[in-house]
UniProtKB/Swiss-Prot annotation:
EC number, as in UniProt: 2.3.2.6
Protein name: Leucyl/phenylalanyl-tRNA--protein transferase
One of the record's GO cellular component terms: cytoplasm
Pfam families linked: Leu_Phe_trans
Family, per entry: Belongs to the L/F-transferase family.
Source species of the chain: Paraburkholderia xenovorans (strain LB400)
Reactions listed under catalytic activity: N-terminal L-lysyl-[protein] + L-leucyl-tRNA(Leu) = N-terminal L-leucyl-L-lysyl-[protein] + tRNA(Leu) + H(+); N-terminal L-arginyl-[protein] + L-leucyl-tRNA(Leu) = N-terminal L-leucyl-L-arginyl-[protein] + tRNA(Leu) + H(+); L-phenylalanyl-tRNA(Phe) + an N-terminal L-alpha-aminoacyl-[protein] = an N-terminal L-phenylalanyl-L-alpha-aminoacyl-[protein] + tRNA(Phe)
Compartments in which it is found: Cytoplasm
InterPro entries membership: Acyl_CoA_acyltransferase, Leu/Phe-tRNA_Trfase, Leu/Phe-tRNA_Trfase_C, Leu/Phe-tRNA_Trfase_N
Tagged with keyword Cytoplasm: yes
Keyword Lyase attached: no
Length: 245
């Protein structure tokens, strides 16, 4: 049975999450709150919230866990060509934390295959915006001719980045933001991005699954490192692909 957490109740050990043969593998607990303090504690333990509007807050720690190592980021020939164009063309920008809440709302509105509605409700936007205001959550945004056309957001502690969601209004705009994030993380020797659950899209970009035990061990060590700066522009794409000669 999945435990219900009161406001002062701690998370159970992640090993108690429901197993692969259950109807909800990885489900660890449920609660009625999404307080910033609860969110911070969750991420530092390798736990994340995911639920539908009208449900209680559901907390997850799946096994295996989908991750992307910045060193293993895959750049297709077409994306490489796009990134070179972005580097040359002043109409393209990468902005960091320009409008965090707007990125979340755009992610909420993005259509997802096989998914109705969104879990990114107004309450979720406010909870993550609280983390953003204290420097624990960030948005990486792709802009073209002064308009935001893609981006992503996630949570960062120490040398660990926890990806949450992304959106694109033009082709490859979310991949541009991800490439910029990967370039920034490479510069700061960050070894892992949490991607939560396996998708073919993430796998095509170099994501892979690892055992939860290994993931949790990495998180525990990484979140205690000093925080990295979150100020960069599209020149971080040079970490991914050199501009055309």
């Amino acid at each position: 049975m999945v435990p219900w957490l009161g406001p002062d109740d701690p998370f159970p050990p992640v090993e108690r999450a429901l197993g692969a043969n259950s109807g909800a593998p990885g489900l660890l607990a449920a609660s009625g709150d999404l307080l910033p303090s609860r969110l911070i504690d969750a991420y530092r333990r390798g736990i994340f919230p995911w639920y539908s509007d009208g449900q209680p807050v559901l907390w997850w720690s799946p096994d295996p866990r989908m991750i992307l190592r910045p060193a293993e980021f895959k750049v297709s020939p077409s994306l490489r060509k796009t990134l070179r164009r972005v580097l040359r063309d002043d109409a393209w920008e990468i902005r960091v934390d320009h409008d965090f809440a707007a990125v979340m709302r755009a992610c909420a509105q993005a259509p997802r295959r096989g998914q109705r509605g969104t879990w990114i409700t107004a309450d979720v936007v406010e909870a993550y915006s609280s983390l953003h205001r204290v420097g624990d959550a960030h948005s990486i945004e792709t802009w073209f001719e002064g308009r935001r056309v893609g981006g992503l957001y996630g949570v960062s502690f120490g040398k660990m980045f926890f990806g949450e969601s992304m959106f694109a209004e033009v082709t490859d705009a979310s991949k541009m933001a991800l490439a910029a994030l990967v370039g920034h993380l490479r510069r700061h020797e960050i070894e892992m991005i949490d991607c939560q659950q396996n998708t073919s899209h993430l796998a095509s970009l170099g994501g892979r699954e690892i055992a939860r035990k290994a993931f949790i061990a990495h998180v525990r060590a990484s979140v205690e490192a000093p925080p990295i700066p979150w100020l960069f522009d599209k020149t971080v794409l040079l970490e991914i692909v050199a501009p055309a000669a």
